[in-house]
Structure formats: structure tokens, C-alpha cells
Design a protein with these regions (language model features):
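Glycine-rich, acidic/polar active-site loops that bind/position phosphate-bearing ligands
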Residues: 2-454
Length: 454
């Protein structure tokens, strides 16, 4: 069975000796042992660089009871297992002005087994299931974000940095310099940047980086979010990956370009098949369409996520696939051959990428195992169809709220298989509490509408 690890763009496979030499040559003082919790929040323990041997020998412990969704206090001893290929000197200095480096870590139990609640370990488990069928998955994520101004006291506002639109340039696009700084920083960290541009909404931006294997892609999304926030802060701005921070304009998505490979070849491509899409591709599409409602709580995990998933703002709402039609949930871009892929348009950038990518992979595998045929592609603008027309074409819709998404997820064996027993249980518990907190909160909208009238 393959031991999956982070794949560097330069193909470099580090040794412990090389890492220690880099640390010494660059006067690195601290090593950040980084991981994510079940909600995808980045956590880290910082250790002096003199502890690098101990870190690389998997000897540094953490208290799992202090991490939401991990361990109870009586079984809380856990260990960092760094992925040596993820070593990276951070291009920005902290407030202390010293150099730091980062290692992305798996979390292991005290008995030396992978912790079933570690999102990164869980993704590796699902990757091993795909490997048994001969498949590996590549994903190219397209994460959007907003840049907001800060007030004189440094507090975050919802005032966008500019009022530019899609593909605009300066002087309307005031974020151009910030984006350039982010791109240069990401390139310094080993990212292959393909494009950057202003998005549709005021203050909204997108930076696209090259696809990678599913584990490396999840690592990259996590690193991307940290880097974007760090560089924005340097410009006295706040970057947010909140899906819908402002009412009435487009929200931020994270379209995922998905492809499966087998024996080194793109398994979605068949030169002689209809649309040049292989049977494997069609089964994967069938699996995604069948199960997408069951994993939407994972790919769109916030109460706020569902403010984005509404008609009228270019967000996918309806369950259909197409060859070019951007009103469909799944789209097959024009390129074929090694570039054949399916674009899933519903995920948002607030998701835990390790869990979201595991869920996407599991839906594809279920489609392949059970030979789930997709319906015919829909090439008309689904947003313009009446509800009667959609019903006639059997075009369903995504869940309209986190509560509805959790109801679908709770009954889904595919979602349970994707997350594993521990994460599934902890995720459901956490998200139900989040919904209850929102459901019982008295909002300003209610006060404005009801306080004087009633």
C-alpha cells in the first residue's frame, strides 16, 4: 500500500539531513508543526529549531483533549508525525522578526497508529480505498476570497477595498498590488500559479494554482488560506474566505476540477466515446450527482454557506451536469486528453479541504463501484427554467440550509464512509450545535422587520 505524502512542485524528496542544513543556512529559529482540526482550522505548535531531530522522529506530543473533536482528557496523549516533504520556510516574518519554517503533520495515537479523527489521515485512508480500485485523484481548486478594509483601530470592517468587477484592471482594481504580492509569496512557497484576477463582486479576488494529487491539493488549500491572510494583513487588509460576507452580491466559491488517473493515464478520457468521456468518467459523474446532497454539509459547512447557494449570483443550485453550461452543478470543460476533468461548482473555500476532497472522492468511487449512469447533460440555462420545467427534467436542487444538508448527511452511508466513524460523529455534533445557535439567535433583520410592527 502506498505511503502517501506531500508532492513538491520541484519533485524534491527531502531527507532529515537536508532539512537541518536548510534550517542552519537560513537561520531558522522556530519550526511550526501544523495540522487542522475537524472544522479545517489551522493549528500549530511552535518548537525551537534545536528540536528538529525530535520533531522528525515523531517524538513531540500534543494534548488531544484541547482540540475540538479530537480526544477526551483520559486518552489525550497524541503525537505529531511531520510530512518531511511539506517543509517550507515561511516567506513572512512574525512580529518577533525571526525566520520560521513549517511542517504539515499527521496526528497519531500513542500506540503509533494514525488517529482516526485526523482529517489528513482520514483523507489518506480514502485514497487507499481508491488505490485498491487502481485509481488516484487529482484536484485543481479555485478558491475565491474578499479583501476588506480595517478601521483606524485595526478592526475588520465589511467595507470592500474597491468597487471593481470581473477582470477589471487598475485604477478600479485596487487589489492588484496585494494580489501580486500574494502570488509572489505563493511562488516562493513552491506554488505553480496559473492566473490571478479580480472577481465579479466588489473586493473579491481569485488566484488559481496548478492541480495536484488530492493530498497535496488539500495541503495547498490550507497553505493558500494562511498565506493570503498573512499577506493581506501586511497591507492592512483583512482577507476572508467566508462564503457570503455581503448581501446582494456574489459569494465566494471553490470550484473543484476533478480527474481520476489509472496506470498513469487520465481515466476520464476515451477518444472514441460519446463526448470523449470514458465509462469511468460517466460513472463518477453519476456518483457525484447521486450523493452530492449527502456531502453538501462537508463541502459547504457553514450556516453562511447557504446564503451563497441561491439562484441569481452564479452559484450552482441545481443537480445537473453539462459540457459547457455554467448553470449546472457539474461541468466538463472543453479540454480533453490528459486535461479531461469534471468541475464540481458547489464547494466553498470555508470547507475543510481534507474532508471535502475525501467526500468528493468517495462519491466518485461509489459511482464506479455501482456503475451509476448519469442522466443526459443539460445545456440550457437552468436558472431560466420554471420549477415545472425542472421537475419534468428531474432536476433536483441542493439543500437550502445547513440543517437540511445535515439531514441528508446523517442518513448517508457514503458520507459515513468518506469521513469515518469518529469524524462523522464529531462533525455532525459540532454542526448541529452551530445550527441550533443560529436558529435561536435574534438577528438584526428580525428586529428591523418586527420590533415596531408588532
Amino acid at each position: 500500500m502506498t505511503e502517501f505524502s506531500h508532492a513538491r512542485l520541484d519533485g524534491k524528496v527531502y531527507t532529515a539531513k537536508e532539512i537541518k542544513e536548510i534550517i542552519k543556512a537560513n537561520n531558522v529559529k522556530f519550526i511550526k508543526l501544523q495540522f487542522v482540526d475537524i472544522n479545517g482550522q489551522v493549528k500549530n505548535m511552535s518548537v525551537p529549531s534545536e528540536q528538529i531531530d525530535k520533531a522528525l522522529n515523531n517524538e513531540i506530543m500534543l494534548d488531544g483533549s484541547s482540540i475540538k473533536g479530537f480526544r477526551s482528557i483520559e486518552t489525550s496523549d497524541m503525537f505529531f508525525h511531520p510530512d518531511i516533504n511539506s517543509f517550507q520556510i515561511l516567506p513572512w516574518r512574525g512580529s518577533d522578526g525571526v525566520n520560521s519554517a513549517r511542517l504539515i503533520c499527521d496526528i497519531y495515537n500513542a500506540d503509533g497508529t494514525p488517529f482516526e479523527g485526523c482529517p489528513r489521515c482520514n483523507l489518506k485512508r480514502v485514497m487507499q480505498e481508491a488505490e485498491k480500485l487502481g485509481f488516484s485523484m487529482n484536484i485543481g481548486p479555485e478558491a475565491e476570497f474578499f479583501l476588506f478594509a480595517k478601521d483606524k483601530e485595526g478592526n475588520v470592517t465589511t467595507k470592500t477595498q474597491d468597487h471593481a468587477g470581473y477582470y477589471d484592471v487598475g485604477p478600479e482594481d485596487l487589489g492588484e498590488d496585494v494580489r501580486s504580492d500574494i502570488v509572489l509569496t505563493l511562488q516562493e512557497m513552491g506554488f505553480d500559479i496559473e492566473a490571478s484576477h479580480h472577481e465579479v463582486a466588489d473586493g473579491q479576488h481569485e488566484i488559481d494554482f496548478r492541480y495536484a494529487d488530492i493530498l497535496t491539493a488539500a495541503d495547498n488549500v490550507t497553505t493558500f488560506r494562511v498565506a493570503v491572510k498573512a499577506i493581506a494583513a501586511k497591507h492592512n487588509l483583512h482577507a476572508t474566505f467566508m462564503p457570503k460576507p455581503i448581501f446582494g452580491i456574489n459569494g465566494s466559491g471553490m470550484h473543484c476540477n476533478v480527474s481520476l488517473f489509472k496506470d498513469g493515464q487520465n481515466a476520464f478520457y476515451d477518444e472514441n466515446a460519446e463526448y470523449q468521456l470514458s465509462e469511468t468518467a460517466k460513472y463518477a459523474i453519476g456518483g457525484m450527482l447521486k450523493h452530492v446532497k449527502n456531502i453538501t454539509a462537508v463541502t459547504n459547512p457553514l450556516v453562511n454557506s447557504y446564503k451563497r447557494l441561491v439562484p441569481g449570483y452564479e452559484a450552482p443550485v441545481y443537480l445537473a451536469w453539462s459540457l459547457a453550461n455554467r448553470s449546472a452543478l457539474l461541468r466538463v470543460p472543453a479540454k480533453r486528453g490528459v486535461s479531461t476533468r469534471v468541475e464540481l461548482r458547489s464547494p466553498d473555500p470555508a470547507c475543510n479541504p481534507y474532508l471535502a476532497f475525501a467526500a468528493i472522492l468517495e462519491t466518485c468511487l461509489d459511482g464506479i463501484r455501482n456503475k451509476i449512469d448519469p442522466p443526459a447533460p443539460v445545456e440550457s440555462n437552468i436558472y431560466k427554467l420554471t420549477s415545472k420545467e425542472r421537475k419534468k427534467q428531474r432536476i433536483d436542487a441542493l439543500p437550502g440550509s445547513l440543517a437540511e444538508a445535515l439531514e441528508y448527511m446523517d442518513k448517508s452511508l457514503v458520507a459515513q464512509a468518506a469521513l469515518g466513524e469518529h469524524i462523522f460523529k464529531e462533525f455532525m455534533t459540532s454542526k448541529k450545535k452551530e445550527w441550533d445557535s443560529f436558529r435561536t439567535y435574534v438577528s438584526q433583520w428580525e428586529l428591523d422587520r418586527y420590533l415596531e410592527r408588532y
